């Protein structure tokens, strides 16, 4: 009975990832990348932690996922496409689903994979067939006869034939059905220790560096065939390559594509693909399992050819490829370059997929992250996840460690206590991860590079940063007059940048305390030099906290002055001011106090009501002062008539 595989499950979009590794919720190794329908499809093996009864220090793979992306940044997991316990010829508990490949031919997608057979020894190579690159795939009941080995790769050559490579560089032509070796496939006897085997195909790595060679990947470029493969040069694998004019050789060795992993990770395995006129190298490394090199993860780098057709050696990076949108989370710990004192480590050594952190140990330390697209940012602010052992400052700059400042962040690890406050109330945030926000002093244009620098006397660790567009709480007022909205709420306000007040709790907002405080500030108002802004609120209430946040001013422990000008064509008698505020507030109409909202209160419409008032013909000035400690300050105000109906027959101006 034919079995249909698990890609019938719903595809799962992953987080936008423009850093290495690119798959961040599971291990992935031995990546084969192919371009189908103008999209990159990634067919890796799937490392897992060995279950009980399996060898704990060896590779363990039970199934295959397929992933795809249009930009090498946003990856979709299409789910499991083949599993060891559903292939008729595979030993169901072998956990040997090693490096695969997938090609398109004759209107079908052919997925090639190795595994341990139920009968015999070693590895066989099977084929599963689908109508779509993500499946569902249906496996053939038997493996390809004549192949005993691992790591299949299929080349569709310009001569019209398909060739399959496997193991330590063996190669044979496939029949047009893509499921059998060609009838004229040569056979040779091969010695392995004291044993002699008869093997199909030709050995394309003969007379080339091939110690413990495996994982061949072959492609064609400018009339040359490139046989690329991992082999052990000293103690761990490198990626080497050879060139030929014939798919089956002979090949001439040309050098390295990638040297040994610096941390001693034993294996590397790869594929090379051209996508949108750029060549890419897909490979693996044990980033998410640094103490276990049998659990690997896929990484990507750009690859370049020299004029003579040779390949420039690729250096692995943490940054990888792809452009990050500024409004997406940027794992800045996967930086492009850094000062020599910067280190990187896993943020969580138990759940390693929680990613990494970059440690910038002292003043002057920096990390640089290339290719961030700011075109999506209109009215933005910064969010950063960071920690420090002591109070310090970090800056976000453009292009270099001395570049233009985008944002400034204060990390307050050890807040100072107000005078007279007992030490027992001190809150210590030393070495605790804090998610902080900061306004932008400057917004780059288009695609640019980010640099994080330490400007304070203590070092800091950074996990991620993200830019966000502010909701449209308000906009600069126009020169034309406005009216209250249908419910009578005044939306145009003139606001002075907030002043700091030493208020840690709103419980002190008694009537007497507020009256004294507001009256003191009123006498100072003519001498205040704060900047004024005239804004139209998008909502019935003016969000003072967001106003302060946007312009980089005092957000908590704040005192706000707010006013608006009401222009009446005639006297409007017997109206009441109905107002609300988050925090305490005091209201004046034409210089006379009309309402006090005391205590620690939330903003509710019509929370307080004045006595009856008259809006006189001509110009009326409504002024408000709001004070708040730890809350999100805002206010609302309207006038209502004797029946409680909103008054709307006046204009609101800024003149």
Where are these regions (language model features)?
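Bacterial Sec-dependent N-terminal signal peptides
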Residues: 1-19
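Carbohydrate-active catalytic/glycan-binding domains of CAZyme proteins
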Residues: 18-477
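Accessory carbohydrate-binding/adhesion or oligomerization-edge regions at the termini
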Residues: 316-332, 337, 469-542, 624-655
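Short edge beta-strand/loop segments characteristic of extracellular beta-sandwich folds
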Residues: 383-387, 565, 578
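Short, surface-exposed beta-strand/strand-loop-strand elements in extracellular ectodomains
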Residues: 393-402, 584-596
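Solvent-exposed beta-strand/loop surfaces of large extracellular or lumenal domains
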Residues: 407-427, 589-611
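Noncatalytic modules at the cell exterior or secretory-pathway interfaces
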Residues: 442-453, 614-626
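Aromatic-lined ligand-binding clefts that engage carbohydrates, nucleic acids, or primary amines
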Residues: 452, 573-588, 622
């Amino acid at each position: 009975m034919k079995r249909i595989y698990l890609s019938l499950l719903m595809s799962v979009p992953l987080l936008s990832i423009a850093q290495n590794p690119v798959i961040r919720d599971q291990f992935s190794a031995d990546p084969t990348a192919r371009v189908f329908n103008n999209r990159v499809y990634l067919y890796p093996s799937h490392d897992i932690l060995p279950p009980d009864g399996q060898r704990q220090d060896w590779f363990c793979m039970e199934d295959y996922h397929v992933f795809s992306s249009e930009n090498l940044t946003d990856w979709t997991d299409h789910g499991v496409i083949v599993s060891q316990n559903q292939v008729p010829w595979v030993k169901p508990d072998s956990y040997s689903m090693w490096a695969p490949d997938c090609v398109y031919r004759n209107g079908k997608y052919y997925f090639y994979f190795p595994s341990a057979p139920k009968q015999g020894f070693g590895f066989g190579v099977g084929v599963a067939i689908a109508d779509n690159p993500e499946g569902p795939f249906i496996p053939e009941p038997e493996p390809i006869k004549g192949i005993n080995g691992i790591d299949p790769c299929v080349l569709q050559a310009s001569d019209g034939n398909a060739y399959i490579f496997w193991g330590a560089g063996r190669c044979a032509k496939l029949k047009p059905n893509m499921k059998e070796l060609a009838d004229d496939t040569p056979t040779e006897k091969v010695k392995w220790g004291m044993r002699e085997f008869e093997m199909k195909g030709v050995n394309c790595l003969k007379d080339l560096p091939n110690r413990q060679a495996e994982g061949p990947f072959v492609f064609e470029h400018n009339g040359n065939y490139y046989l690329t493969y991992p082999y052990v040069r000293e103690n761990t694998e490198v990626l080497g390559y050879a060139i030929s004019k014939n798919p089956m050789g002979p090949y001439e060795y040309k050098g390295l594509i990638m040297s040994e992993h610096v941390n001693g990770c034993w294996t590397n395995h790869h594929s090379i693909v051209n996508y949108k006129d750029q060549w890419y190298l897909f490979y693996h490394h044990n980033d998410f399992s640094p103490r276990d090199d049998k659990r690997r993860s896929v990484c990507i780098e750009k690859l370049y050819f020299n004029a003579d057709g040779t390949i420039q050696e690729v250096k692995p990076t943490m940054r990888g490829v792809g452009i990050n949108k500024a409004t997406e989370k940027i794992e800045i710990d996967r930086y492009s370059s850094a000062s020599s004192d910067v280190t990187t480590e896993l943020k969580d050594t138990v759940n390693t997929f929680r990613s990494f952190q970059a440690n910038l140990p002292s003043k002057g330390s920096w990390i640089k992250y290339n290719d961030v697209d700011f075109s999506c940012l209109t009215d933005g602010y910064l969010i950063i996840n960071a920690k420090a052992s002591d109070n310090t400052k970090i800056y976000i700059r453009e292009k270099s460690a001395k570049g233009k400042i985008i944002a400034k962040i204060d990390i307050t690890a050890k807040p100072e206590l107000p005078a007279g406050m007992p030490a027992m109330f001190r809150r210590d945030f030393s070495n605790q991860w804090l998610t902080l926000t900061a306004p932008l002093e400057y917004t780059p244009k288009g695609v640019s590079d980010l640099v994080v620098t330490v400007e304070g006397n203590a070092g800091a660790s950074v996990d991620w940063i993200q830019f966000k567009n502010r909701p449209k709480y308000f906009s600069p007022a126009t020169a034309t007059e406005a009216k209250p909205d249908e419910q009578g709420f005044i939306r145009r306000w003139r606001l002075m940048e907030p002043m700091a007040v030493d208020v840690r709790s709103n419980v002190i907002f008694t009537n007497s305390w507020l009256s004294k405080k507001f009256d003191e500030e009123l006498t100072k108002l003519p001498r205040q030099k704060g900047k004024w802004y005239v804004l139209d609120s998008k909502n019935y209430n003016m969000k003072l906290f967001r106003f302060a946040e946007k312009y980089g001013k005092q957000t908590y422990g704040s005192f706000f002055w707010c006013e608006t000008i009401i222009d009446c064509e005639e006297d409007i008698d017997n109206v009441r001011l109905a107002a609300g505020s988050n925090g305490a507030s005091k209201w004046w109409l034409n210089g006379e106090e009309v309402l006090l909202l005391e205590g620690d209160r939330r903003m509710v419409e019509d929370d307080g009501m004045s006595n009856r008032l008259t809006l006189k013909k001509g110009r009326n000035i409504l002024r408000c002062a709001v004070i708040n400690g730890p809350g999100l300050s805002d206010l609302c105000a309207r006038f209502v008539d004797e029946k409680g109906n909103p008054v709307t027959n006046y204009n609101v101006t800024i003149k």
